[in-house]
Every structure is written in structure tokens, then in C-alpha cells.
A protein has these predicted regions:
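A general, composition-driven signal for non-globular sequence regions
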Residues: 3, 15-17, 70-73
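Exposed acidic/polar residues on beta-strands and adjacent loops within beta-sheet cores, strongest
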Residues: 24-146
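Bacterial N-terminal signal peptides
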Residues: 9-19
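Bacterial N-terminal signal peptides that target proteins for export
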Residues: 1-11
Length: 146
């Protein structure tokens, strides 16, 4: 096999591996089964209300609903990263009521990787991680996210 074919196959395999570990974007408004209970995202006058059952636990401005979800072993959502007009918002459904953490920086999220308690985001402004409410811009490194 030629070196070019070997290199091409390795590149394709790497791309497939990367895509399988990145979490896809969803626009589901609900019902969404989470560890905290059933969640709905209802449109209101300026954006959306995040409802756990019949109680609103957050409101955010957004033209459209977009979120990246992490599913637990039983298939229910454990965490979700919401795309809002003011930047990403992390909902941690492992707690009841859900923990809400705002990134505090306007950016458009393209891909999300869940790493323990941190969420790593590829955005239009570069790579960032959100951990315990702190947003950090990531520098080039050899760490692999999957």
C-alpha cells in the first residue's frame, strides 16, 4: 500500500473517531427525560423558559433553541449546554433543582466534549472549557478530548 493511501486512511479514521466523540446539537423542546425530572423548553416573549415539571428554573434569550446533551448510562440527560444570545449556559441535571452555570461570554458553540465535571467547547472564538462556573480559554496542547 502506498504511503499516500496509508496517510489518507489514517486521516479518515481520525475524522470518524473525532466525530463519534463529539456530541451532536439538538433542538428538542421537550419533553426531555433528565436525571432531575422531565424538562421542557417553552417559548416566551423574549426567548425560552426552562421548565422542570411545572416550575421554571431558568430563562434565556435565544432566537432558536439549540443544546448539546450528555446522556447518562440509563439514557436520561445528565447535563446540557444551551446556546443563548448571551453565550453558553450549562445545566447540570444531576442536581435537583438543576445547577445553572453561565459562561458569561458571547460565543457560538460548534462542538462539545464532556470530560468529567468540565465541558470543553469548540467555538467560533476558539477552544474553551467551562468548569465549576469558570470559563477558561484553552491554549494549544497535546491533550486529546473525546
Amino acid at each position: 500500500m502506498s504511503p499516500l493511501k496509508t496517510c489518507l486512511r489514517a486521516a479518515i479514521a481520525s475524522a470518524v473517531l473525532l466525530v463519534t466523540h463529539a456530541h451532536a446539537q439538538s433542538d428538542a423542546a421537550g419533553p426531555v427525560a433528565t436525571q432531575a425530572g422531565t424538562v421542557y423548553f417553552l417559548r416566551d416573549e423574549s426567548g425560552f423558559a426552562a421548565m422542570l415539571g411545572t416550575q421554571a428554573f431558568d430563562r434565556f434569550d435565544a432566537r432558536r433553541l439549540a443544546h448539546f446533551d450528555e446522556a447518562g448510562s440509563n439514557g436520561s440527560i445528565t447535563r446540557a449546554l444551551m446556546q443563548t444570545d448571551t453565550g453558553p449556559v450549562l445545566y447540570d441535571f444531576r442536581r435537583n433543582p438543576p445547577l445553572v452555570q453561565r459562561a458569561g461570554k458571547r460565543m457560538t458553540v460548534q462542538r462539545v466534549f464532556w470530560q468529567g465535571d468540565e465541558v470543553v467547547m469548540q467555538t467560533t472564538a476558539g477552544w474553551y472549557k467551562l468548569e465549576r462556573g469558570a470559563l477558561t480559554k484553552l491554549q494549544s496542547s497535546t491533550k486529546t478530548y473525546h
